[in-house]
A protein has these predicted regions:
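Nucleic-acid endo/exonuclease domains
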Residues: 1-127
Length: 127
């Protein structure tokens, strides 16, 4: 069992706002491609503090939307503590390893990325 048994509560609501504006933009971009698939948002991974921003169960594709705090220390997001930033980097690495181990393609989208089909094809992911 990879995900919590109550995974249904994480089923995506395509119209509901997301944690961030960019995450909502990604959701709206993938909707025409994934609208008929089984898709979850903020899906928790069993036995960890990890969650996946989006997970398509039909295609075994996860999407992580990475804000600037995933690329550099940010006093606000990391509570003015560099150890918190290092912990975040470790969690990001754990997500990558989790996905690799379980045959899940992971697409990481950063704030500055142009959300497009070309972006997904760089990860060899075809929507």
């Amino acid at each position: 069992v990879l995900f919590r048994s109550n995974a249904r509560k994480y089923a995506i609501n395509w119209d509901k706002k997301s944690k961030s504006d960019i995450q909502f933009r990604v959701k709206q971009f993938i909707r025409p491609y994934w609208g008929r698939d089984i898709v979850f948002e903020e899906l928790r991974v069993v036995g960890t503090r990890l969650s996946l921003d989006f997970y398509n169960a039909n295609k075994k594709i996860a999407i992580e939307v990475q804000g600037k705090q995933h690329q550099q220390f940010n006093k606000f997001f990391h509570n003015n503590n560099r150890a918190n930033w290092l912990d975040q980097l470790k969690r990001d690495d754990l997500k990558l390893k989790f996905c690799l181990t379980n045959g899940i393609k992971l697409v990481e989208i950063y704030e500055d990325d142009e959300i497009s089909i070309d972006l997904f094809s760089k990860f060899e992911v075809y929507l």
